[in-house]
């Protein structure tokens, strides 16, 4: 293939990758028209899981599932992400502090990083990754995980959840399961 043809293909491939991975960045002349929108298969799967985990049905849920980490900066506000992330970090810290369990050596939350040191299983670290619009979990039980911020608008109320970018599992359920195992008592957020 000559250089001229290669240079013509590179922008088209870049546009195709950008459009399928980040639909909000798609130019107006791209693969979407006014009546349809482009959504990746993984974003579609996350949207379905988000609707399913909130108990939403088509009748009660607006078609407003926002997968922030796939949108680039479109629709993103620092306040919305930071508020949701800080609320979850503070909730985990408060609930663990309230348990007064011998299995917990120390729990602290500073600068968007929650550290939970256990006596026997190791350290859990949950931290904000604002540039990626994600929360990252380092677990001594299951290893590292990245969670995307998902919002679902249902009956006029917005609900935030955190879904794994790998397999779509829910962060809160993962924490409840693993902390119940480590602490030896039921842990609910």
From Swiss-Prot:
Subcellular localization(s) per the UniProt record: Mitochondrion
Annotated TM spans: none
Entry-linked Pfam families: Frataxin_Cyay
Enzyme class, first EC level, given as a word: oxidoreductase
Record keywords: Ion transport, Iron, Iron storage, Iron transport, Mitochondrion, Oxidoreductase, Transit peptide, Transport
Any GO MF annotation of the entry: iron chaperone activity
Catalysis performed (reactions): 4 Fe(2+) + O2 + 4 H(+) = 4 Fe(3+) + 2 H2O
Domain of life: Eukaryota
InterPro entries for the chain: Frataxin, Frataxin/CyaY, Frataxin/CyaY_sf, Frataxin_CS
Subunit: Interacts with IscU; the interaction is direct.
Protein name: Frataxin-like protein, mitochondrial
Annotated organism of origin: Leishmania donovani
